[in-house]
Amino acid sequence: HVLGTYQKDSNIRILDVCTGPGTILLSLLHYLPNACGMGIEISPDALSLAKVNSERFNSNDRVQLLESDMFSALDGENEQFDLIVSNPPYIRTGDAKLLSQDVLNEPHIALFGGEDGLDFYRILAKTCGTYLKSQGHIAFEIGFDQAEAVKALLEETGQYSNIRCITDLGGNDRVVTAVYEG
């Protein structure tokens, strides 16, 4: 969906919140060769992996990676983006018992989004507007049953239009997108 929103030669600025190993940001930069991006991540280990991946994909000159608890390392007045993407932790804390051991071996900070799985989406919904240009886009990966709740969080702010959910190839809700009207 995101790639269909922009022309291949678009000169846009992308922010990836909870970038982890940089997969989403680096993939977007691969397909948008004139774009530049910033990835912010609280985990030093994940950020180190993102730096390795950035070097591997020869995108260091277009990527800035920062250790940050969500938006804390950014200056809202001086940091404006055309697109904000995020695959935040979204598993409900109570669902840990349903996960395989392989998943549970992952750092819990990367998995759990609070009691209802929406803690990070609340922050994203309230804060993204500070860092988006007018008519900027957001795209958040979600859990299979979180589309309506995440859409409602965005609607409550009154800052977004064209709020919708994109399904994955299996027909499951996967990404919520919207346009910032600030």
Language model feature labels by segment:
Residues 81-82, 101, 152, 159:
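S-adenosylmethionine
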Residues 9, 32, 58-60, 106, ...:
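Short, well-ordered coil/turn elements that cap or connect secondary structure elements
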Residues 9-11, 80-83, 107, 142, ...:
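N-terminal/domain-start segments enriched in small and hydrophobic, helix-friendly residues
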Residues 28, 102, 124-128:
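Class I S-adenosylmethionine-dependent transferase superfamily signal
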